[in-house]
Amino acid sequence: MRCPYCQSEDTQVKDSRPAEDGAVIRRRRVCSVCGGRFTTFERVQLRDLMVVKKSGRRVPFDRDKLTRSIEVALRKRDVDNDRVERAISGIVRQLESSGEAEVTSDEIGRLAMDALKGIDDIAYIRFASVYRNFSKAVDFHNVIDELTVAETEDDLDA
């Protein structure tokens, strides 16, 4: 593994342990040249997914882009990073295990919204405003109403 600080390929693994309920291996590494320390994650990738954009263009699935989108929605929210990482891994597992080589950007957005709904209401609303392309204040009210109805139904089921 190349050092992110000095680009040397002489790095050593100092610690390995399972993460995300065993779905990932977390490795602490140290560079033999500059002494820099960094963490890497090893995940299983079942297949190369292609994302079909709304324009019809096809691009390779990018887990980092999904992560950034969810992190933007969660900015300044007090949410445990492990919980977020588990949600992202869950989305990726769903996509990879679907058996399809292509997935639409809408499907990825829907899965991200479902995950955020279970994590943080404010992040859910933020993500929905971009994903659903809100243009009026009433769009926000509608999503808040959806959340309120869902919470009321959950309270009745409990």
From Swiss-Prot:
GO molecular function, one term: ATP binding
Region described as Disordered: 1-20
Protein name: Transcriptional repressor NrdR
Provenance organism: Brucella anthropi (strain ATCC 49188 / DSM 6882 / CCUG 24695 / JCM 21032 / LMG 3331 / NBRC 15819 / NCTC 12168 / Alc 37)
GO BP terms, alphabetized: negative regulation of DNA-templated transcription
Binding note for cofactor: Binds 1 zinc ion.
Keywords from the UniProt entry: ATP-binding, DNA-binding, Metal-binding, Nucleotide-binding, Repressor, Transcription, Transcription regulation, Zinc, Zinc-finger
Pfam families: ATP-cone, Zn_ribbon_NrdR
Domain of life of the organism encoding this protein: Bacteria
